[in-house]
């Protein structure tokens, strides 16, 4: 009986141990599953905060919610161990980090959009530049009317003057015929006759060259050569009178400037090989750019004027006026172009203005243009500065102090040279904190009349300075 009691006691103890072990194992499994679920819950709650759902206004509610879940591991347990003030500081820092990240993301997105727009603009400018070069090449290759097409498959209709003779610039185009008006036989006949005429003309040129050599020897020793020299001197006087008249018209009214432009344009065929004529024609194109109101006409005048100034520079690099007006037309053309083209024109503008000042340092116009360039560069936008740095090795750099020195130099060389120049001086002094000097130059600017369009445009700036500086 005692043996059975002992056996029953041992079995009861063994059962108690097994039950205790099973209970502990079951509790471990439950705790492990609950810990994993809590970890997943913590990650799902922290994810929205990284995606712009954090709100500082609900900080107290979030702290209460974390405290209301007892026994959970993770951030809630960590925060619950901190005092109320410490929890608020941690949440404030997290909100600040998230807000900074969101602001950074918006800035990156804005920069990406700007770069995409800039890339599209550059591609468009390159395409338009290539198309313009192709048009110029076609104009140079086909200076006369193009030959009519022999294609009969196209339904296009080309129009050409039917007067028979070649039209000049002064003539007007008369009646029109279609491209397929002539028969194939007539075109073949015309080509054969043209070939025959070419052969005859070649023989004529050869004979003419031989005769001209003999004639030159005779003319050189004849009394008529003295008369030819007199004609050359009279022709030189004529061109000098023409250039003097163009200078006087340039200094006159708007109508005078238009007359000067037409005068030079009409005489381009006769004197277009002279450098002093070409830069004056470029100057006249600059005047027309200022006078016209239509944007397309402004760009056309500026482009043609830049080409004339470039042709003048090809005649020689020692002409200060050619460099000066090339720079002016670069600036006028840049007003109708994109940001990258404007920055490139800015480099070219500075280069030619510096060259003009080097060749003619006593001319106030060069110093005025340099001062205006420095002032505009000192006020470039952030995007323009970054674009210049990205596209060019040496970015544009200038200060308001640089601009002031150039404007003062122009005023020193010729007092009262420009009303706009005095307004610029006043603006520079104001930005440098010298209001008394700014007020002085503002009063001096009011004494000058409006001569150029730039002077008139600065009237509004002058009035604003009056309000800021007072009288």
Swiss-Prot record:
It is a single-pass membrane protein. Residues 91-125 form a coiled coil. InterPro entries: RMD1-3_a_helical_rpt, TPR-like_helical_dom_sf. Keywords: Apoptosis, Coiled coil, Cytoplasm, Cytoskeleton, Differentiation, Membrane, Microtubule, Mitochondrion, Mitochondrion outer membrane, Nucleus, Phosphoprotein, Transmembrane, Transmembrane helix. One of its GO terms (biological process) is apoptotic process. GO terms for cellular component: cytoplasm; glutamatergic synapse; intercellular bridge; mitochondrial outer membrane; mitochondrion; mitotic spindle pole; nucleus; organelle membrane contact site. Residues 168-203 are annotated as: Disordered. Residues 1-12 are mitochondrial intermembrane. It is found in: Mitochondrion outer membrane; Cytoplasm; Nucleus; Cytoplasm, Cytoskeleton, Spindle. Residues 191-201 have a biased composition (Acidic residues). One of its GO terms (molecular function) is microtubule binding. Residues 36-471 are cytoplasmic. A motif (FFAT) lies at residues 157-163. The chain crosses the membrane at residues 13-35. Phosphorylation at Thr-160 of the FFAT motif activates interaction with MOSPD2, VAPA and VAPB. The modification Phosphoserine is found at residues 44, 46, 50, 57, 183, 193, 212, 233. Belongs to the RMDN family. Interacts with PTPN2. Interacts with microtubules. Interacts with VAPB. Interacts (via FFAT motif) with MOSPD2 (via MSP domain). Interacts (via phosphorylated FFAT motif) with MOSPD2, VAPA and VAPB. The transmembrane region is required for mitochondrial localization. Involved in cellular calcium homeostasis regulation. May participate in differentiation and apoptosis of keratinocytes. Overexpression induces apoptosis. This is Regulator of microtubule dynamics protein 3. It comes from Rattus norvegicus (Rat). The lineage of its organism: Eukaryota, Metazoa, Chordata, Craniata, Vertebrata.
């Amino acid at each position: 009986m005692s043996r059975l009691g002992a056996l029953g006691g041992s079995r009861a103890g063994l059962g108690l141990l097994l039950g205790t072990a099973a209970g502990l194992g079951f509790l471990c499994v439950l705790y492990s599953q609950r810990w994993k679920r809590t970890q997943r819950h913590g990650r799902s709650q922290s994810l929205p905060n990284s995606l712009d759902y954090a709100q500082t206004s609900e900080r107290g509610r979030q702290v209460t919610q974390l405290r209301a879940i007892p026994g959970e591991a993770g951030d809630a347990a960590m925060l619950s161990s901190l005092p109320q003030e410490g929890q608020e500081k941690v949440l404030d820092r997290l909100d600040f980090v998230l807000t900074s990240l969101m602001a950074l993301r918006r800035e990156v997105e804005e920069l990406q959009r700007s770069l995409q727009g800039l890339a599209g603009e550059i591609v468009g400018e390159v395409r338009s530049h290539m198309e313009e070069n192709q048009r110029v090449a076609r104009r140079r290759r086909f200076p006369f009317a193009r030959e009519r097409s022999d294609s009969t498959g196209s339904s296009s209709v080309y129009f050409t003057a039917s007067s028979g003779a070649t039209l000049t610039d002064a003539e007007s185009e008369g009646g029109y015929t279609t491209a397929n008006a002539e028969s194939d036989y007539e075109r073949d006949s015309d080509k054969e006759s043209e070939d025959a005429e070419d052969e005859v003309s070649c023989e004529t040129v050869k004979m003419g060259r031989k005769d001209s050599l003999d004639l030159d020897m005779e003319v050189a020793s004849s009394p008529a050569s003295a008369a030819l020299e007199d004609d050359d001197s009279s022709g030189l006087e004529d061109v000098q009178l023409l250039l003097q008249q163009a200078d006087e018209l340039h200094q006159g009214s708007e109508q005078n400037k238009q007359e000067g432009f037409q005068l030079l344009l009409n005489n381009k065929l006769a004197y277009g090989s002279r450098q002093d004529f070409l830069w004056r024609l470029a100057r006249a194109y600059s005047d027309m750019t200022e006078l016209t109101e239509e944007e397309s006409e402004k760009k056309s005048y500026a482009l043609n004027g830049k080409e004339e100034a470039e042709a003048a520079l090809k005649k020689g690099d020692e002409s200060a006026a050619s460099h000066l007006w090339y720079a002016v037309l670069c600036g006028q053309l840049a007003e109708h172009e994109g940001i990258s083209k404007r920055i490139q024109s800015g480099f070219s503008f500075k280069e030619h203005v510096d060259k003009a000042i080097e060749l003619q340092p006593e001319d106030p116009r060069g110093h005025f243009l340099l001062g205006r360039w420095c002032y505009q560069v000192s006020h470039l936008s952030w995007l323009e500065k970054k674009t210049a740095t990205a596209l060019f090795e040496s970015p544009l750099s200038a200060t308001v102090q640089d601009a002031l020195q150039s404007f003062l130099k122009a005023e020193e060389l010729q007092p009262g040279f420009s009303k706009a120049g005095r307004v610029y001086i006043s603006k520079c002094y104001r930005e440098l904190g010298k209001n008394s000097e700014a007020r002085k130059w503002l009063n001096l600017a009011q004494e000058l009349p409006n001569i150029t369009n730039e002077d008139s445009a600065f009237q509004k700036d002058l009035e604003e300075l009056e309000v800021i500086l007072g009288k």
